[in-house]
From Swiss-Prot:
Gene Ontology terms, MF aspect: ATP binding; magnesium ion binding; methionine adenosyltransferase activity
Keywords: ATP-binding, Cytoplasm, Magnesium, Metal-binding, Nucleotide-binding, One-carbon metabolism, Potassium, Transferase
Enzyme Commission code(s) on record: 2.5.1.6
Family annotation (Gene3D superfamilies): 3.30.300.10
Protein name: S-adenosylmethionine synthase
Amino acid sequence: MAKHLFTSESVSEGHPDKIADQISDAVLDAILEQDPKARVACETYVKTGMVMVGGEITTSAWVDIEELTRKTVREIGYVHSDMGFDADSCAVLSAIGKQSPDINQGVDRADPREQGAGDQGLMFGYASNETDVLMPAPITYAHALVKRQSEVRKDGTLSWLRPDAKSQVTFAYDEGKIVGIDAIVLSTQHCDSVSQSDLVEGVMETIIKPVVPAQWLNKDTKFFINPTGRFVIGGPMGDCGLTGRKIIVDTYGGMARHGGGAFSGKDPSKVDRSAAYAARYVAKNIVAAGLADRCEIQVSYAIGVAEPTSISIETFGTGKLPEDKLIALVRQHFDLRPYGLTEMLNLARPIYQATAAYGHFGRNEFPWEQTNKAEALRADSGL
């Protein structure tokens, strides 16, 4: 592999699509807190002055969807009509139905260990040793930039910031190793009164420099800070938002393949979510065990069937074992049936709203980021 560039982007919690994701996961968490066996598929749409929450939910729990929605929007920071969106005055509409009994009969079993997958589908997990969290660097630093934007907005360091923001980071690689950063883009919503020069200086000194390692910056690194020159109208006033539209931001920033299924608003019986988390867990433990420098795993499922219909692994020439041997180790050490992966990662609990902004992976507070299988994988590998 010769020299090449690779780019990933992220968006802040105030981006319209991320508002929708966070509302969907806030509803999911509130339900799981009361009913861990609930079936939830919650979708959200946001636009100027309104939120619509819909989907299919089967549960014994009762939650106040309107209050959950307003609380989530308020915590993000949309608290005044001059932002085009106000937690206290926006309309909240609800269109919730129940999960189809045709799906239930394929999922529920007398023996929960034989629980079938809630749908067909394919999921990917990925890990790389290029960062300490075993994630690709471009998405890791893209997330870090918009997370820092949120921090300095909320603590008042840059009081003219508003909730909506986007980042993009282009890394330069040589023979697969990072040699620097070629470009950084950061666009942030702001109040009308701040000058472009103050904004550029504030973003550079307060957001970019504290986040990006200086050794990756050089005289040729390009910075694009609010390159249009103005970003006052943002959030749902600028664009409508929908749950599940940021699936590449949520995962690996394009560095790995994606099966197409979104995460937010889905309970763990939906393998779109739970199997993608388990696949990350597997890939991360393989890399942590030193069995590969990079690892991508694919799993697939059929609706109503417990066992995965396929498992495949790609190590991009970095594997220390043949891939069929790695797959055998995965089958030995990980239960990838829907019930098994829910139990393995303790997923039937309210942990999801925190995942809905700044990435689902590379954050050690989540159970699928543990590397507690690495030692056993290494021991059984024969290396």
